[in-house]
Amino acid sequence: MCIRDSSIEEGVTTIDSNLLFSGNVKKINIPKSVTKIDAAAFMYCYDLQSINVDSENDRYMSEKGILYNKAMTRILCYPAGIKDTEFFVPDTVTTIDDLAFYGTKALESVNIPDSVTNIGTDAFGECSGLKEVVIPDSVTSMGEAVFYKCTSLEKVKLSVNITMPNPAVFQYCSNLKEVVLSENMRFLGDFMFSYCTQLTNIVLPDTLTSVLRSAFQNCDNLKNITVPKNVTTIQDYAFGYYYDEQSATYKKYDDFTISGYAGSKAQEYAEANGIRFIELNKKETTDGIKIEYSKDDSSIGGDNEEKISLESRQLTESDEEYSKIDFTGKIEDSDVKPEDVKSVTYEISLKNESGQTVQPSEKVTVKIPVPDGYMGENCKVYYVNEKGKFTNMNAVCQNGFLIFETAHFSTYLVTETNIKTVSEITYGDANGDGKIDSRDAVVIKKYVAGFTGFTIDLEASDVNADGKVDTRDAVKILKKIAGFDVTLGET
């Protein structure tokens, strides 16, 4: 039977998936006699804007056209045709049911309260307008394919209590770029991020033990992944593969690499599948600050890597380096005064056997412990240059560490306060004097030669955008000055 009008007759007790509604129905009235509604009952009612339940119904209720159970502890159906772009789930709700938001097009943001503990299968499936979701730490279970084909979803943060997610949670989220996984996650489910074609980077937590079949299949722009040493299971096609529909076979990405530690499951998987493996090394300071880098390249001291030490010290107001830190006029949080900014500042450096400061030639991964008394998820890490300008390192909090990449060690500040950052980099202005001339090329050459005691803006110096500062940057600046058709700041 196909229902085209808006009312269900009194006496009907069950609305199941076999009771087909017209695709263009906009309003449905549910009588008091209904005692059971199937999760898929309204699945394809893409124009539906309102569900109204008789107030005398003992099992169900509605509010603002949205269907709940009588106690309003479960949200059962948010009609797909509602035009609102934002929705706040009521704080009485503990469960978002299977298919609850399925097919919603206009919705861009859903605010999930701490009362929610369970999110059902396909709860947000094919919500094509949804852009950003934060799963609160109260959530302990999620069904399969929760965000299946959310093609506008760009950012997501998972609850710390999600340890073993079900399959295909983010499958076909083709615009997903930023993911913060649970710090306690043990498994990555089958097809969890498959066909997330815009995903370029993801930090896997140290607690991870298993990556299941095809977890990152068809992630076209994911070129490298670092696999934690605790991973003991990696199933078929988990990394580095795509499914070729023409030939109906799995194929490897030619340019994919796996980073990990010697003797690990990551190395075993890479070698078994003919994928390039990059062995990682690490160093640590007495402050608990760690760096990870490739053992294969010369980013840390080349052949003298073992003689390079990582050092750090926490700065205080009496330190000369601290004098450049001034928050005046640089705070985005209107309720925070400069003198009230809570922060921890480190001077981080690499030293050779002669005690001279050296810099890595490639980007390395840095892990700074979350300071005592700080909320890791609220922390930001800023690089502070010689002129006191702040650059947000876009650190990710995982397992009690703030993790980011850099090719330069200097002053780094950890705070929960939002600070205004450098909005524009003048590529080529290596010495920071506001103009681009041969003196900038000289500064870069001095830096490459290992000289110290001068100011250099390493971000502005990387004019060929390859993530490092070397003589090629100096040459490009000289070409620009000579009138060659080159663009600074691009490869």
Set out the residue ranges of the language-model regions.
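Consensus positions within tandem repeat domains that build extended binding/scaffold surfaces
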Residues: S17-L19, A39-A41, L76, D98-A100, ...
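Surface-exposed loop/edge segments in extracytoplasmic proteins
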Residues: G388-N394
